[in-house]
Amino acid sequence: MAAPGDPQDELLPLAGPGSQWLRDRGEGEDEAVTPKGATPAPQAGEPSPGLGARAREAASREAGSGPARQSPVAMETASTGVAGVSSAMDHTFSTTSKDGEGSCYTSLISDICYPPQEDSTYFTGILQRENGHVTISESPEELGTPGSSLPDVPGIESRGLFSSDSGIEMTPAESTEVNKILADPLDQMKAEAYKYIDITRPEEVKHQEQNHPELEDKDLDFKNKDTDISIKPEGVREPDEPAPVEGKIIKDHLLEESTFAPYIDDLSEEQRRAPQITTPVKITLTEIEPSVETTTQEKTPEKQDICLKPSPDTVPTVTVSEPEDDSPGSITPPSSGTEPSAAESQGKGSISEDELITAIKEAKGLSYETAESPRPVGQLADRPEVKARSGPPTIPSPLDHEASSAESGDSEIELVSEDPMAAEDALPSGYVSFGHVGGPPPSPASPSIQYSILREEREAELDSELIIESCDASSASEESPKREQDSPPMKPGALDAIREETGVRAEERAPSRRGLAEPASFLDYPSTEPQPGPELPPGDGALEPETPTLPRKPEEDASSHQSPAATKGPGPLGPGAPPPLLFLNKQKAIDLLYWRDIKQTGIVFGSFLLLLFSLTQFSVVSVVAYLALAALSATISFRIYKSVLQAVQKTDEGHPFKAYLELEITLSQEQIQKYTDCLQFYVNSTLKELRRLFLVQDLVDSLKFAVLMWLLTYVGALFNGLTLLLMAVVSMFTLPVVYVKHQAQIDQYLGLVRTHINAVVAKIQAKIPGAKRHAE
């Protein structure tokens, strides 16, 4: 296809892969490049047989144009290993120009030659068979021709031939790698993404094509006669469906820092006559800073819509559109600040964009922190200018993604870039640019994967917590494992404070422990002191002290096995519950009444009997005085005995009753409130019941109470109150034990007594009219 400029310009033919397009300078001014083994290009008016009708048609147009018309400039595309086809043997672009009005096509040629760098070349312009024809570069004989080998031709080490917003970059290729790719059909199929680039005409120049129908006919005839050299690729569009190319203007001063190709008008006559050698290309993905594009647009706003128009200040660019994606993980955010061109809106580049989009989608699967392999030091030093303009690291091609996807590792692991320059080069927009790249080739997308910093920090925290917990477990061995796992490790300062607090409490309870350790009579020194807890070790790191329990006397332990149905001693008390009084405890009273501790029960039972018999013989005042004298005589005698014993043995054991002296016998407010409430309940209940009986709320109940009082008159005449109290105490200490031993017989007799009593009550109720009606 061709892109006509203005009436003074010639159509620009598109060169397919494996073919070379050449336009010789007219009137014998310049000579074309004559490769080894190829036929020299003829002068104007003498087309060579190798070029056929194409060269003859060009010569005739050139001869008839005259000085008023400018000779056309053709852009030429070639691949490695092509020999003897046209005037340019085995490299990409070669153009010639005729002196005219000063407007011509810009060439993609650099006259600066550098030593060949075989190790830094890639080639991705793959050729393949189409429509049953074989292109020239696929000929095995020509690929094996010694004259066409790439090492004999010096490479061009331009670090960016030109750049555009489409971002396709050219890289020198190596002949050995090209032969390998061409020989392998599988690699040839995988590299279809780099086959063709569609350069078509924009809509704004269609009217110019209508003004020159004969030029269009000549150009179409010119292409039809050249089908034996260049076969039209499938990816190239027809003229009726153009994908316009957006022309971007880049000034000369923006391109001074890199070795860009000079323009045609700037070339001298010697340079035009000299053979121009170029290198094959590789299409890679790079990025351009938006600032450069903005500067370019501000400086040349009126030339944004010029598409391949002959001018010394223009550089043709090729735009390969990519689908915009607003997702956060997208590497191709929507373009801003510039209107999308026709090629961008259509998104139908002749480069296999299915493969390119597949590569972009695969890159989307990764995070923004896609790792880039470290660049060589030499390459970083050689490309300071390119870093200022180039974008983020090279996006891997579809071929490279097959290898990089296998190395991506676990999807949960973030990819962190090891190259510090990757963060500086990270830009939001992706482009494709043409240009010769020197130095070592860009490394394929095989990022070195490492764990993210956050994950490493988390693992370090877990390790430190495990170490702290192990240390705490060793220092506090009595703590339960569940508490060690659930509760966070405590600091040493908190543990020290707990140890000091427990130590102070242990010192306060020490006298009470020693007092309970010594044997003494509970009858002589009854106490209502709360039960003290055992002392905690000063160095114990346990947070929960053991619950204090009352020590069991030997008598109680000896009598505990006598009754299997009897309940054992009092259990451990809760930390918040106030300890009850010694002789007012319900469990303690049950143990005394059931004679579970014979010695203790005997002492208590004997003391009660002595007191009651004394009261029967003497007055209460006399009994209290005598009991006090007896207690004092016992304590004083024991105190003197201990003092004499310590003097004789020359020991200093201290006061014999020191433990009891330090024992606190005060009642707490909670204990007083507890027993006061209980007493209040019984007092109130008794008063209510007496009121109900005496006020005859219920006649039957009142009569029963009257009968009870009549019987008590007989009991009072026979027994004294102290005798009754004595009989009650004896019954309390004897009846429970007798009932346990003879429970079956007692229950039988109690049943008979209950039946007899019920019969008597029934007879009495039958004789009382009011009681009978009440029973009904």
From Swiss-Prot:
PTM remark: Phosphorylated.
Gene Ontology terms: biological process: brain development; endoplasmic reticulum tubular network formation; negative regulation of amyloid-beta formation; neuron differentiation
GO cellular component assignments: endoplasmic reticulum membrane; Golgi membrane; neuron projection; postsynaptic density
Segments for region (Disordered): 1-103, 136-168, 204-244, 285-580
Lipid bilayer topology: Multi-pass membrane protein
Transmembrane segment boundaries: 603-623, 705-725
Compositional bias segments (type: Basic and acidic residues): 204-240, 497-511
Boundaries of every Reticulon domain copy: 589-776
Keyword list, A-Z: Endoplasmic reticulum, Golgi apparatus, Membrane, Phosphoprotein, Transmembrane, Transmembrane helix
Keyword Membrane belongs to the record: yes
Modification Phosphoserine, positions: 327, 350, 352, 487
Role, per record: Inhibits amyloid precursor protein processing, probably by blocking BACE1 activity.
Protein name: Reticulon-1
Native species: Pan troglodytes (Chimpanzee)
